[in-house]
């Protein structure tokens, strides 16, 4: 059967039974849709009757909110799908507006409409499919060539799961009030509320948080998006999507799921954000991790003469397929870890480089573990050009940079044997931009020339892939000599610790060295592949092997034969 880029799944089974049926339904849908899957909840709708069914309100209860959580949890097993539960017809007890009084536009118009509704004979019965298509197009903007499919998932026994009438989903949404509530208790609606987060690489746990907030809000939802100082403590912050990109993805998702709301997306620059200062807000949705932060917001509000917000706590979604060193919850940190070793942007064509030689530039801040990665690549078959080694050749007496450097910085930078004391020279230039530029204007062109000569040596030895290991690769402009830039990143605090331990410098001297270099963020912005040595050695090895294997797949055969 054809695979569609976008689809609409209309769920008609009563909630009490639907929860147990979700896994096979999602599996069936994932075989037909390969990108965006919208979900419309209409329990009890009959597509087999004489009358054309119409959209009707679904009472927002805690059971419905729990179901939303369970659906997104199940969707996490199908990572190729961008699942979006549509909320226009899910309404709180305080507001019953006309449901879908006009056709709702969707960012990705469905090409196919699917349903769990089944005919008695298990066929693709045309009148039912026609009713389904009419229902879908009366509610949402769909593709003109809309197809329809009645799903018949394998439920094991072939029968609906039998559950006692009081069998309810476990609670995943908790109001801050200690008062016990029934899962079928209606949810209160509020005029304005707030939710906050980093929202990097929007995932299903984010979608639960945002969806609950959208159900509770009747007029406006304020969304705080973490930026600047609040990002510094994040794992692999260099791989965070830019603020504008995160806001763009958030906006599309929010407008898709509940266009009747007004959304205000603002930078979150401190732990309180708008929730701490806006007197018109009534509720705040938090996760288990941020619940204490929500309590702190309420204390801050009380201290400043504002009413407390109603807090709604969402349980964390368990990541059922997390890897080693990843969190056991669905998180953006794990998504960023999975990017390590992947190609982030296309390689560069370098026709001026030696024919038949593919060149990687390996860089990273001091202490990043770049040289250990170079050794791992060497073990896999790469020819390594060590820029530090070339620098030693350039600085050596009689070397191409020796005399110009001595003339520029004086003979007091020399050892008694006439060799350049690089520690003394380094103390002159680190932290002094003018002196550093004088040195680099001399040395960088010399090392670049030596590197090109080494490329010719690699070709003569029959090598087809070489790596230029250079901390200053991008500062020196040597990216023009490579097809791909690979960057090794670690937190600056870890880099300082390693430099102090390795080189015997003070923390201040180590920080000064790092400040004279491009930041990890600046390096990543110009990189094709990113790696990290933050974890155990075997984790680094797995990353490097992953990156190497992906490289082999995208290399032309001419570059693969002699390594």
UniProtKB/Swiss-Prot annotation:
This is Bifunctional coenzyme A synthase. It catalyses: (R)-4'-phosphopantetheine + ATP + H(+) = 3'-dephospho-CoA + diphosphate; 3'-dephospho-CoA + ATP = ADP + CoA + H(+). The modification N6-succinyllysine is found at residue 461. Residues 179-357 are annotated as: Phosphopantetheine adenylyltransferase. Widely expressed with highest levels in kidney and lowest levels in colon, lung, intestine, and spleen. Pfam families: CoaE, CTP_transf_like. One of its GO terms (molecular function) is ATP binding. GO terms for cellular component: mitochondrial matrix; mitochondrial outer membrane. In the central section; belongs to the eukaryotic CoaD family. Residues 359-562 form the DPCK domain. The modification Phosphoserine is found at residues 177, 182. The keyword Kinase applies. Its EC number is 2.7.7.3, 2.7.1.24. InterPro entries: Cyt_trans-like (IPR004821), Depp_CoAkinase (IPR001977), P-loop_NTPase (IPR027417), Rossmann-like_a/b/a_fold (IPR014729). It comes from Mus musculus (Mouse). One of its GO terms (biological process) is coenzyme A biosynthetic process. Bifunctional enzyme that catalyzes the fourth and fifth sequential steps of CoA biosynthetic pathway. The fourth reaction is catalyzed by the phosphopantetheine adenylyltransferase, coded by the coaD domain; the fifth reaction is catalyzed by the dephospho-CoA kinase, coded by the coaE domain. May act as a point of CoA biosynthesis regulation. It is an enzyme of class 2 (transferase). CDD domains: DPCK (cd02022), PPAT_CoAS (cd02164). ATP binds at residues 364-371. Keywords: ATP-binding, Coenzyme A biosynthesis, Cytoplasm, Kinase, Mitochondrion, Multifunctional enzyme, Nucleotide-binding, Nucleotidyltransferase, Phosphoprotein, Transferase. It is found in: Cytoplasm; Mitochondrion matrix. The lineage of its organism: Eukaryota, Metazoa, Chordata, Craniata, Vertebrata.
């Amino acid at each position: 059967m054809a695979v569609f880029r976008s689809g609409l799944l209309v769920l008609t089974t009563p909630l009490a039974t639907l929860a147990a049926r979700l896994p096979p339904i999602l599996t069936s849908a994932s075989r037909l849709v390969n990108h965006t899957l919208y979900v419309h909840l209409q329990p009890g709708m009959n597509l087999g009757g004489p009358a054309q069914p119409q959209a009707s309100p679904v009472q927002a209860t805690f059971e419905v909110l729990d179901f939303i959580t369970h659906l997104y949890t199940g969707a996490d097993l199908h990572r190729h799908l961008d699942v979006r539960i549509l909320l226009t017809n899910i309404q709180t007890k305080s507001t019953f507006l006309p449901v879908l009084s006009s056709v709702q536009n969707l960012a990705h118009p469905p090409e196919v409409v699917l349903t769990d509704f089944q005919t008695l004979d298990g066929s693709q019965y045309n009148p039912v499919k026609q009713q389904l298509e009419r229902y879908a197009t009366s509610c949402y903007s769909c593709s003109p060539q809309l197809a329809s499919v009645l799903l018949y998932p394998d439920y094991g026994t072939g029968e609906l799961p039998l559950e006692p009438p009081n069998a309810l989903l476990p609670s995943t949404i908790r109001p801050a009030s200690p008062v016990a509530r029934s899962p079928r208790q209606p949810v209160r609606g509020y005029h304005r509320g707030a939710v906050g987060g980093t929202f990097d690489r929007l995932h299903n746990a984010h979608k639960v948080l945002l969806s609950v907030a959208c159900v509770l809000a009747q007029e406006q939802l304020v969304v705080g998006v973490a930026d600047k100082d609040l990002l510094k403590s994040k794992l692999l912050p260099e791989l965070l999507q830019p603020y504008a990109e995160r806001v763009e993805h958030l906006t599309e998702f929010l407008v898709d799921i509940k266009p009747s709301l007004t959304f205000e997306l603002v930078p979150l620059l401190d732990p309180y954000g708008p929730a701490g200062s806006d007197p018109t807000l009534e509720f705040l949705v938090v996760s288990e991790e941020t619940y204490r932060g929500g309590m702190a917001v309420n204390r801050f509000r009380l201290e400043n003469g504002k009413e407390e917000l109603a807090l709604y706590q969402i349980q964390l979604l368990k990541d059922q397929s997390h890897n080693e060193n990843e969190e056991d919850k669905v998180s953006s940190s794990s998504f960023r870890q999975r990017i390590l070793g992947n190609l982030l942007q296309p390689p560069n064509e370098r026709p001026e480089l030696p024919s038949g030689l593919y060149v990687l530039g390996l860089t990273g801040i001091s202490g990043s573990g770049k040289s250990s990665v170079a050794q791992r690549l060497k073990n896999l078959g790469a020819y390594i050009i060590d820029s530090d080694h070339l620098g030693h050749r350039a600085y050596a007496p009689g070397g191409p940079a020796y005399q110009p450097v001595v003339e520029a910085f004086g003979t007091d930078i020399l050892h008694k044997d006439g060799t350049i004391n690089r520690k003394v020279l380094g103390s002159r230039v680190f932290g002094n931009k003018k002196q550093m530029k004088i040195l680099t204007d001399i040395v960088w062109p010399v090392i670049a020339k030596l590197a090109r000569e080494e490329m010719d040596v690699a070709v003569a030895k029959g090598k087809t892939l070489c790596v230029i290991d250079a901390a200053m690769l991008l500062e020196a402009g040597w990216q023009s000599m490579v097809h791909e830039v690979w960057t090794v990143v670690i937190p600056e605090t870890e880099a300082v610790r390693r430099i102090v331990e390795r080189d015997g410098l003070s923390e201040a001297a180590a920080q000064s060295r790092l400040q004279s270099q491009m930041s990890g963020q600046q390096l990543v912005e110009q990189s094709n592949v990113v790696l990290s040595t933050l974890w155990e050695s075997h984790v680094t090895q797995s990353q490097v092997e992953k990156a190497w294997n992906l490289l082999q797949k995208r290399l032309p055969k001419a570059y693969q034969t002699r390594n």
